[in-house]
């Protein structure tokens, strides 16, 4: 999304991604005109490196989730859901760093306080779920997962941690077999190729 926005605004961008990022995602970023650089095995390593790089080179750093403007933008998804499905009583959202679910649930729960918000994470990388259980941001090593868009940890002091604690009613942890099954279901029954992170929810 950031790469697309930079292309639309004519802004030159540099996007850092973990080493294990899918080639499809990397190519999509490159096709938007941004330079892509790889660093680290985990999202937190990549974020910390990117933040330091931006500071040292006098660049603007944009977090993929730990930013109120980013979360507000993702809240428009919550608006669309409630606009199209005003009577829905449950919303499930894939969770990595927590930006998307923070944005969606902030608006959705404002519209309907009785709404159930379910955070969905791959069992192999459920850092937010385990951190909320422990009531602190944990530094947990993630296992490989088909859901690379939600993989990795959460940076210390992330604003999404408190938001997720307040807004998520429960978590569902999804196995790798379930992720693959959901991906195949979308291909077979809906003729849609979705990314692993989407199939988690």
PLM features: residue spans?
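PLP-dependent amino-acid enzyme catalytic core
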Residues: 1-201
């Amino acid at each position: 999304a950031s790469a697309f926005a930079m292309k639309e605004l004519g802004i030159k961008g540099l996007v850092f991604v973990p080493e294990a990022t899918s080639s499809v995602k990397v190519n999509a970023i490159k096709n938007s005109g941004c330079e892509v650089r790889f660093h680290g095995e985990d999202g937190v390593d990549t974020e910390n490196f990117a933040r330091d790089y931006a500071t040292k080179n006098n660049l603007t750093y944009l977090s993929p989730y730990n930013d109120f403007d980013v979360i507000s933008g993702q809240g428009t998804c919550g608006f669309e859901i409630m606009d199209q499905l005003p009577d829905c009583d449950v919303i499930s959202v894939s969770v990595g760093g927590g930006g998307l679910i923070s944005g969606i649930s902030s608006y959705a729960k404002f519209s309907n306080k009785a709404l159930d918000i379910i955070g969905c994470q791959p069992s192999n990388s459920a850092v937010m779920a385990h951190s909320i259980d422990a009531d602190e941001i944990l530094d947990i090593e993630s296992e490989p997962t088909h859901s690379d868009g939600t993989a990795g940890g959460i940076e210390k002091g992330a604003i999404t941690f408190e938001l997720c604690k307040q807004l998520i009613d429960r978590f569902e942890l999804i196995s790798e077999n379930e992720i693959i099954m959901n991906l195949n279901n979308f291909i077979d029954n809906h003729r849609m190729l979705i990314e692993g992170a989407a199939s988690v929810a």
